């Protein structure tokens, strides 16, 4: 499923946020979303699972970001909102049958629960019929 709900609110997956904070190249629509967040014109929810994956990737040296750098970035811009993993999010994820990887399903479940588009470059998530995506 692709695009469009509340035009100024989104959920991000791990790589979307990593690529943005590392100032790596992003497609124009995604760059525009993150630019809007940082100018106060949009909100991006960051699922707890995204932060946990960032910890794991940093510890395994698969990304150059530290958790401290992530925290500083999120604190610098007030329109990033951490979103907790709750039973309601887990229930939303339980309905997603076409994303087999649990962590991805929990991130997609957050977007589904919030009824928001998910910023992701993951082809499995993009192909899902349960969540709308933007990339």
What are these regions (language model features)?
Residues 1-8, 77, 108-135:
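Acidic, PIN/NYN-like endoribonuclease modules and their adjacent C-terminal/linker elements
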Residues 1-46, 59-72, 128:
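Short, well-structured N-terminal submotif of metal-dependent ribonuclease cores
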Residues 14, 48, 87, 104-105:
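Conserved glycosyltransferase catalytic-site signature
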Residues 17, 51, 90, 125-126:
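A generic structural signal for short hydrophobic patches within well-formed alpha-helices
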Residues 43, 81, 117:
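Residue-level detector of anion-binding/catalytic polar loops
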Residues 71-97:
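Acidic catalytic patch
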Residues 98-103:
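Donor nucleotide-sugar recognition loop
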């Amino acid at each position: 499923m692709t695009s469009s709900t509340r035009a100024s609110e989104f959920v991000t997956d791990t790589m979307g946020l990593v690529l943005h904070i590392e100032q790596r190249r992003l497609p124009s629509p995604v760059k525009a979303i993150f630019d809007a967040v940082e100018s106060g014109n949009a909100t991006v929810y960051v699922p707890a699972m995204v932060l946990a994956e960032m910890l794991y990737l940093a510890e395994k040296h698969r990304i150059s970001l530290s958790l401290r750098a992530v925290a500083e970035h999120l604190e610098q811009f007030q329109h990033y909102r951490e979103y907790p993993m709750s039973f309601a999010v887990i229930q939303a994820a339980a309905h997603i049958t076409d994303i087999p990887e649990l962590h991805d399903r929990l991130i997609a479940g957050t977007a589904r629960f919030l009824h928001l588009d998910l910023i992701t470059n993951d082809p499995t998530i993009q192909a899902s019929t349960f969540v709308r995506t933007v990339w």
